[in-house]
């Protein structure tokens, strides 16, 4: 076959490959197709075009009619629920109808052609059939499960000869008529045909599984229990092993059944309705590892959207960049030996340290030091929400005091209730976290390995998961946070998931307390809320669905710390979860509708303003102990006892909620953002001990803040130059402090991120220097122009004085000459203004026609990022009426309409021309007013056009923003957060 013929065959493909069918994308028909190439997937085309085997119209009509008949039969049974005798007669009638249907099914099965063989979809619809005299009626398409129970214990009734003959006929017909490919559902009244024996057996098993349900009534959010008024009757099907089971009727009145409208498609169901969740519906971003060894997915709120290297584990970084980078890689579990040398299977046994060795290891002087450091620096951001500090420290001191008395130590670690508060794995995890604040990475690895060994390896050296306890749960969460700081993202996520599952196994989410043991109740409550906070932090940071759920309408219970900061932080997280979810929810159906995306964007922007107000209300509602503002922060920053963790949590929530809009020239509450940046600078610059900042909450808040500052600085122009110059200085400071405070050589998670930020800021710093030089040159040119104008005014005044001294007959000639000079000067000034406009930096002329939409966007962005410094002048809620804001939105969303580009270009040109004319008119009017006030009656009424002379002359606007590539990447980059939310992606990650 020639290549040309092969190409034609590929172009004639009428079916899509399996990958394109899965992701619902258009397939180009190539082998492999473009979508499979981009995803490194195997391109497989189905051998059979199922469209050629569609159901016939007659077959579909039969299904619809049969479905309606089944619905009528169910409704007739429900109507007779209060009359047992009539109900029995109706059931007998249905059985007789099914028997007559079986007699006609053989003759009509061959008459309906074009119907495919009985498939799963047909089988699920044909769920009404008889089984040896037993009736089961079910309609899944109508969402109903209806069981007919014929009680054989209360009343024995012998079957009539007619029913026996019907049963025999049913059995014979079933055995003698296998399902044929051309079989179909007949239009015979009352009931569907009986399927083949294999299908009967399968359905019999499904029915047995359904009969295990203890409650035969609809379960939903509105049903309180078996005594509810809408409970369905006790009508169930009984399956017996014999084909000759008799039929009996329970003469006792059944419970009342709900009456459903005959026209409605819904029927009662035995399946519980899913609980509502306020989790995030995010479009995931996938980061494949080198060689495709793993695949990590992150949602829209994640901070890991700047670079692929941010999400790599240490082993992936080592494979990608080699072993030159210093890795904080954990050691394997020590002392592993092979118990068998068999080549087919090798049994692994871990030789754990003895209890004496472990006690000595966790009670030496170095361990005591690091244990104290953990509660000094790690308590405020995390441990205070998870571990009862006083109780754990007291028990650890007792262990250290009795370290030579092994029996006493074993009693503390193994007997109730002290074993609910402390364990070896928890002590080792705390020592490892304390070693991190001493930059002792070897000690971190040593004690972290010890903690994980005690968690999962028993005394026999075997891997176990059958023990749950609160100290083990706490140790898992602490180890997960340490793993995250060391760059092991997958390990941290999975370890925290095991811990949360263990908490559910312990029942810490039940909120049921025993007054006889208040200490355990307080511990259970504290561990739940600490786990909840860590779970929500992880969900926001990774952009993933969380595990623990708390309804914000339910009163919260905080037993051990009613007046502390735990209720404040928990309430903040609970209230903001639905807010963040609504901001980040992906709307994939508007992908090809820019106008709808624009509408959704404006709606979410409007919601964002209300959410920011709610955040401000939460902050203002704090008690005096925890409330802060900029002035309070300045006065208390040098006090080391002041806890700033609640402030950092507030910053993190605000930055996550506003992240998509902070990456636009105009799009968020810039005033609050400026306030947060200033406060964060004060904390990081003047805090007495910067080790209090060495935690993951500070790290993620700092990463989001730097990303937002990079975006804002990228939009620098003449209007916002002053504010963005301040942003640039703060950006440089934050990156320097990030390397100092977060120990990038110890916390591998920071190393590559910090390097990327440094490269980006160096580039922006060069652009800012160039912009500053241009603006300085422009300012000098303006000063020279003003000096020339002042000289011109002085000459005019001197000439006027000379005119007053000259004879009257010479004045007229001199006045004519002066008017001519004024006209020439006016023409010359207009030419200078035009030349100045032309000399401004513009995109290259040769690319105007080739890339005009991009040029148009860059020119329209010169006024899009004016700083909002006064809420009264520029309130955030009035941005929907802001012309510059709406112009930015048009650039974002109308860009994808290629057919309207020419019309849009003409409109933008006309709009720009009109704006320029209006600006010139306004300037001329202002100049005339100033001249009228300064000039005397003898001076000419028309002077050469000159710019206005305010106190601070306005700097001409530059036609380009500082770094237009950043804005363009928001629209073009498929991996951007803004792109994932508002459906800009042309390829996307929605697999």
Swiss-Prot record:
The lineage of its organism: Eukaryota, Fungi, Dikarya, Ascomycota, Saccharomycotina. InterPro entries: Transcr_Regulatory_Elem, Transcription_factor_dom_fun, Zn2-C6_fun-type_DNA-bd_sf, Zn2Cys6_DnaBD. Keywords: DNA-binding, Metal-binding, Nucleus, Transcription, Transcription regulation, Zinc. Residues 807-817, 825-855 have a biased composition (Basic and acidic residues). This is Transcription factor ROB1. Residues 169-187 have a biased composition (Polar residues). One of its GO terms (biological process) is positive regulation of filamentous growth of a population of unicellular organisms in response to biotic stimulus. Its main location: nucleus. Disruption phenotype: Severely reduces biofilm formation. Causes defects in proliferation. Displays abnormal colony morphology and invasive growth. It comes from the Eukaryota. It is found in: Nucleus. GO terms for molecular function: DNA-binding transcription activator activity; DNA-binding transcription factor activity, RNA polymerase II-specific; sequence-specific DNA binding; zinc ion binding. PROSITE patterns: ZN2_CY6_FUNGAL_1 (PS00463), ZN2_CY6_FUNGAL_2 (PS50048). Pfam families: Fungal_trans, Zn_clus. Induction: Induced during biofilm formation. Expression is dependent on both auto-regulation and cooperative interactions with other network transcription factors such as NDT80, TEC1 and EFG1. Expression is also induced during mammalian infection. Expression is repressed by caspofungin and caffeic acid phenethyl ester (CAPE). GO terms for cellular component: chromatin; nucleus. Residues 17-43 bind DNA. Transcription factor that mediates conventional biofilm formation and plays a key role in microcolony formation under both flow and static conditions and to epithelial surfaces. Modulates infection of mammalian hosts. Residues 150-188, 792-875, 901-959 are annotated as: Disordered. SUPFAM superfamilies: Zn2/Cys6 DNA-binding domain. The gene is ROB1. Residues 152-168, 795-806, 907-931 have a biased composition (Low complexity).
